[in-house]
Curated annotation (Swiss-Prot):
This is Peptide deformylase. The keyword Signal does not apply. It comes from Parasynechococcus marenigrum (strain WH8102). The lineage of its organism: Bacteria, Bacillati, Cyanobacteriota, Cyanophyceae, Synechococcales. Signal peptide: none annotated. Its cofactor is Fe(2+).
């Protein structure tokens, strides 16, 4: 049965296998987050065959790097590792709230309703532009212990999951921007090049 993010979070809180790491910035994050123009961001990620302690430690290092960069989501390809692994935390202020770890995520359904919302990305710092996405999704994935899970998400959580899952296919949010003038201005203002955007229909 699909559960909400809150239900999954409560279940994680009640177990010993949470992925809690301090939600504070480190002087030197364990992983480098690659930025627009890096070829590693355009490569597809591979499914993870077996979830191991090495997988969990990668997720922890991703969280440490994400918190240091003050982000709410990070995909393994952003740190140069082409595995289907995402970490998300929409509650950065609450140290006790566990993050969400998604391994081999697959969207099984998306709402017909769509909305437009401003997105940013740790791989394109400073750039914020509107992107259209389905309002709600249903997905299946494995958690940090390798257990199969199902989940329904809407609002910011649905958008964040879709954004991070794009990274697994070498797609960045700027590829989905339809405001060409705004895109060119934002990229130029923050030192990025339009030629590194690969627009998708």
């Amino acid at each position: 049965m699909a559960g909400s993010f809150a239900q999954l979070a409560r279940a994680a809180e009640q177990s010993r296998d949470t992925m809690l790491v301090p939600k504070t910035a480190l002087e030197t994050p364990p992983l480098e987050i690659h930025t627009l123009g890096a070829e590693v961001l355009r490569q597809s990620a591979r499914r993870i065959g077996k979830v191991t302690e090495q997988t969990r430690e990668l997720a922890r290092d991703m969280l440490r790097s994400m918190y240091t960069a003050k982000g709410i989501g990070l995909a393994a390809p952003q740190v140069g590792i082409h595995q289907q692994l995402l970490v998300i935390d929409l509650d950065l202020e609450n140290a006790a709230t566990p993050p969400l770890v998604l391994i081999n995520p697959e969207i099984s359904a998306a709402s017909a309703s769509i909305d437009t919302y401003e997105e940013g990305c740790l791989s394109i710092p400073g750039v914020y532009l509107d992107v259209v996405r389905p309002t709600a999704i249903e997905l299946s994935f494995r958690d940090e212990m390798g257990r199969p899970r199902k989940m329904k998400a809407d609002g910011l959580m649905a958008r964040c999951i879709q954004h991070e899952m794009d990274h697994l296919n070498g797609v960045l949010f700027v590829d989905r921007v339809t405001d060409e003038a705004g895109l060119q201005k934002e990229l130029k203002d923050h030192g990025f090049q339009r030629q590194h955007v690969q627009s998708v229909s």
